[in-house]
Amino acid sequence: MQNISRDKRVQAIIIGYMFAAFIEGAAGFGTPAALAAPLLLALGFPAMAAAIICLVFNSFPVSFGAVGTPIVMGLSPLKPILDAGVADGGMTYAAFCKIVGEYCTMMHIPMAFILPVFMLGFMTRFYGPNRTWSEGFSAWKYCIFAGVCFSVPYFIVAWTLGPELPSLIGGLIGLGILIYGTKRGFCVPETTWDFGPHEKWDASWTGSIAASGKTEFHPHMTQFRAWLPYAIIGLILVLTRIPELGLKAWLASFKLSFVDILGYQGVSASIDYLFLPGTIPFTLVAILTIGLHSMKANDVKDAWTTTFAKMKAPTIALFAAVALVSIFRGSGVNDAGMDSMPLALAKTLAALTGEAWPALASYVGGLGAFITGSNTVSDLLFSQFQWDMATQLKFSKEIIVAAQAVGGGMGNMICIHNVVAVCAVVGLSGSEGMIIKKTFWPFLLYGIIVGIIACGLVF
């Protein structure tokens, strides 16, 4: 990284914005900020600045994170409703998800340009030696360049291939173009900016892990070998998500079915176990990487042990959320003829907010992410509620549900689970409240912009 640029503003964009966007597209669930923040710390960033930058930037890629999981899986409570309408000429669940993804890009993309400029100004104002906004704002050309690098493939993929690959492809292509342009000085600020001497930093900026002062790094493998697993993941995902190639239908044909669950007729479920991203490509590439990186047995053991340890919390949360969603959906089946919980909430809020709801819908998604720790779980909990709100108010269901998905993405920056994880990896455990106080303002700004766009689309 030091060979590309020593300007901390540039490093924040490359690592905190672009690299984290790619990791979000591939893995999600809090991984990007937890990976990117220690990298910034190693480059000499104050721990507090590294944590806040990575949390805030991990927002617009999130709706398409983990190969589209927040939309493809998160909106699954709507699948029975949509499937029931297909016979009458209604759209399929897959078509609905694609349209929701398209609207998500329209709400997210403005922030892919606004947020970098704002955050660099924030960084130089609160963590710079001169305490000015202008030093960060002066890198606006580079921020616009980064926004174009990410947003163009992000938008194209969402509108052509669907909601699974926009962040992954946008981050991968954007990262390559951004690094290439940076090395050649394209839109790079003329002066190099830094945080100043460590001894002048405020004590609250640092934690138990000291920021690195190293300027040299000696790699233990080539760039090609380091990036090869990510490239293979991206290639396999693209090849298996294009229907015309036939791989998508073939992989989806392998199903694990559960019929008449617990003895109840008609209560069935199935899993396309080979089409799941966790199987192909992630598990497949994880096994291939052992050979590609010539990993030793102990390294392989440590990697898998760490992976399963990190999976515990999100797995438990997802199991609990799916069960809770089933209760929400089933609450409408009762002898008293009462509405389901989501529908009852929707009717009450529709009466209170009226036509102002599109301006507020994203904050519900953000609240869900704040509480549950995930955009996916937020969508699982509130997608049917948003659907019912749109039905009550006669708004486009796709737009209102998209605002929910976008809200879950922007909620990542205040999400308790993510904040705790980032604080742990940069040595700031105990400072979570201070960080949320800082990230709340970008969250509020994000929601205002999304609300304006949603209102424009609806009206």
PLM region spans:
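Hydrophobic alpha-helical transmembrane segments of multi-pass integral membrane proteins
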Residues: R6-P38, A42, V56-S59, T315-G332, ...
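Transmembrane helical segments that form the transport core of multi-pass membrane transport proteins
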Residues: G170, K200-V364
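Membrane-interface interhelical connector segments
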Residues: P70-G101, V333-E355, L381-F385, Q392-L393
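Re-entrant/interfacial helical elements at transmembrane boundaries that shape
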Residues: T31-L40, L55, G68-P80, T376-M389, ...
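Short amphipathic alpha-helical coupling elements at transmembrane boundaries
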Residues: Q2-R6, P38-A42, L55, D302-K310, ...
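Transmembrane alpha-helical segments in integral membrane proteins
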Residues: F113-Y127, T279-V300, L367-S374, H417, ...
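Juxtamembrane and boundary regions of transmembrane helices in multi-pass small-molecule transporters
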Residues: S63-H198, V406-F459
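Alpha-helical transmembrane segments of multi-pass membrane proteins
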Residues: R9-A21, A47-P61, A87-P116, A317-A320, ...
